[in-house]
Amino acid sequence: MLIFTIPQFFFAAWVMVVSLQMQGYISCIEKERKGLLELKAYVNKEYSYDWSNDTKSDCCRWERVECDRTSGRVIGLFLNQTFSDPILINLSLFHPFEELRTLNLYDFGCTGWFDDIHGYKSLGKLKKLEILDMGNNEVNNSVLPFLNAASSLRTLILHGNNMEGTFPMKELKDLSNLELLDLSGNLLNGPVPGLAVLHKLHALDLSDNTFSGSLGREGLCQLKNLQELDLSQNEFTGPFPQCFSSLTQLQVLDMSSNQFNGTLPSVISNLDSLEYLSLSDNKFEGFFSFDLIANLSKLKVFKLSSKSSLLHIESEISLQLKFRLSVIDLKYCNLEAVPSFLQQQKDLRLINLSNNKLTGISPSWFLENYPKLRVLLLWNNSFTIFHLPRLLVHSLHVLDLSVNKFDEWLPNNIGHVLPNISHLNLSNNGFQGNLPSSFSEMKKIFFLDLSHNNLSGSLPKKFCIGCSSLSILKLSYNRFSGKIFPQPMKLESLRVLIADNNQFTEITDVLIHSKGLVFLELSNNSLQGVIPSWFGGFYFLYLSVSDNLLNGTIPSTLFNVSFQLLDLSRNKFSGNLPSHFSFRHMGLLYLHDNEFSGPVPSTLLENVMLLDLRNNKLSGTIPRFVSNRYFLYLLLRGNALTGHIPTSLCELKSIRVLDLANNRLNGSIPPCLNNVSFGRSLDYEIDPDFGSSYGMVRADQELEESYSRSLVLPLEFELDYSGYLDFTVEFASKRRYDSYMGESFKFMFGLDFSSNELIGEIPRELGDFQRIRALNLSHNSLSGLVPESFSNLTDIESIDLSFNVLHGPIPHDLTKLDYIVVFNVSYNNLSGLIPSQGKFLSLDVTNYIGNPFLCGTTINKSCDDNTSGFKEIDSHSGDDETAIDMETFYWSLFATYGITWMAFIVFLCFDSPWRQAWFRLVNVFVSFLKCV
């Protein structure tokens, strides 16, 4: 047995402490290790793979866990972006961590909190919790009552959730230690209340909500310690708050994208700690002089614009400016000249003077005056001369001169002057001539947009070799010709190529080297030959070669490419359709206006949202398609399809547009079509911005220092390169053929069975399509009555029943249709009075021609009460008194003609004076003809 003296004991203890410190920290306690293992069930295994059940495993060394180095207690849990499925969190799971200071559940998939034992007091068990990040989850107001118990909180982040209603002051009143509060990106509304109890707040972010009203003394102005305030993207109104003059510690103020109005007051000059001031996208008016902010010596970022077009910025100033700006943003300010004071702002790194009335020469003046400039945005002005300094080599990264009035050749030295450019947008101008070969010196260029100009010729070989970092290239709407890329080509980083509406004739195989290509748009060129088989080597999301001269069959290599959109329309492709394509979820397949033949494969609808096979040479019957609840658009018009309309179409319940026109379909219309939605029940709602095909956001790291080190604002200048599929549906409605895209297709629901061989009555069940906007059953052999149930088509705009054999009256209740523009029943056998109320007043006579028994003021034909054929029938009567029995009519007509001819023949068979007289008459007539 060892016996230690007191000095020896303290020495041993000291050695133990030192050894532990040398190890970094002691092991975590067992209670917390078990607590972490309970949490593991809610964390994606990918992020908790080292959370081991082994009792020898030190949880302080586990990923996403932070422990105190001295006590070994867990003080930080960083579970952000680790969820597997949306969950309701039991807060008692965190109770073992009594020393917890930071709990990061950002993007954790949390839908709410609960604690069956401690209830709303649950967070009070975490007495040292200082930072709680619940950003970008799915929680609503149900979590708010839990917050008052967390009185130790200094940072509370709730942005990007589903909070709604007014500012939750009641639930936050006990959080008197809060220094940062982020409620951005929710659904909060109403005025901002008094916040005196949150007097320690340094940073407050209320952006991207719908807060409204004016800002008075009882609200934000009580927060004297406030350093950062973000009110952007709300609905605040009224003038700039005078009481903001008391917020003397304010360093960041963002009031952009609201409805603030009036003139900008002098109190802004009192905010002498400001580094970042954004007043853009409001309704300020009057004259603004930079003298107003001349004394803000710390100001680095200034942004101002107005929605009202009544804001005018004075170009000249009288005071000496004390600030040295890094960022100036004056878009939408009605500027006719560059403000003179900018010449002294040599530290500028970002200039945005877009959407003004600037003219003259650009961008040489800016490049010569601002050696530190990294971003120059001058889009939508009236510059006419594109000039660059001859000997200067500039470090500019971003240049946007789109939508101006340049109409000359691009400078030959553009690549020499701008070798560091990464983003260049010269679109929507009138640039002419060939592409300068000096583009090849832009080794860092990532994005190049030359679309909508008059550029011509072929792409230079040096360009295709030198721009090795190019990822997005837009050449559409020019006059480029020849091969798309000459050999050799080293655009290995190319992901997006948009070159539609040019005169290219050939796709060369050098494109094989661009392995990351996901978006290829080559429509409306003069491409010839077949689709290259090596297209199958790409991981395509978007491929469009429509409106070219391509022919042959679809190469089998394309069948397994993961498309989101494939458009081969308006070419000369032939052969049978493949049995399937490997579409991602909700793909778009356009094969219309080709020469495809054979049957329609039943498997084509797998993972497809739209199938367009219009105007081919397809034959056979419509197959029983594989069921697909996401399938919305089926377009088979203009083929040679035969047989009945299959009842299996009724299983495609989400259909919005069904076009089977101009085929040879026969039989009757299936009544079960009322199972199809046509917008009646939108169980599945499509986003009009569906299908982001390529999405990239790039930040310019060198601009980071241009923004204040803000807790609530982005630190970088970012460019969003998201691209969207042009989702288009062509459909005949209101006597014309229209293309629906963007927001418009969201409201298009239609059915077209016209120009077939359909018979039988129109099913009354078609009246269940309450949201349908266009219904065309014309040019068939449909019989019976116009269904009275059509009065239930409350959103209908166009009904075409022309060229059928319908009879009976036009139901009077159709006058209830408030949006009807076309009601064409011409060339039928309808009878009775034409309705003349509501929208029917504006319908002209062409809608009714070919119906001899119709009458009314619309066709200027009176109705005779004594003629049963002209009587208006009670739409609710079961007896059709005016209806003509067409079968009896045709049999009577046939019998009359038959009996007449038989009598005439019998008459000629008997010898009589009448017979002799008849033959003499015939002889006289023949002699007369000979004389003539």
From Swiss-Prot:
It comes from the Eukaryota. LRR repeats lie at residues 97-122, 126-152, 154-174, 175-200, 202-222, 223-246, 247-273, 275-295, 296-320, 322-345, 346-368, 370-393, 394-417, 418-441, 443-466, 468-491, 492-514, 516-535, 536-560, 561-583, 585-605, 606-629, 631-652, 653-676, 745-769, 770-792, 794-817, 819-842. Keywords: Cell membrane, Glycoprotein, Leucine-rich repeat, Membrane, Receptor, Repeat, Signal, Transmembrane, Transmembrane helix. Its main location: membrane. It holds the Pfam family LRRNT_2. Residues 29-888 are extracellular. This is Receptor-like protein 9a. It comes from Arabidopsis thaliana.
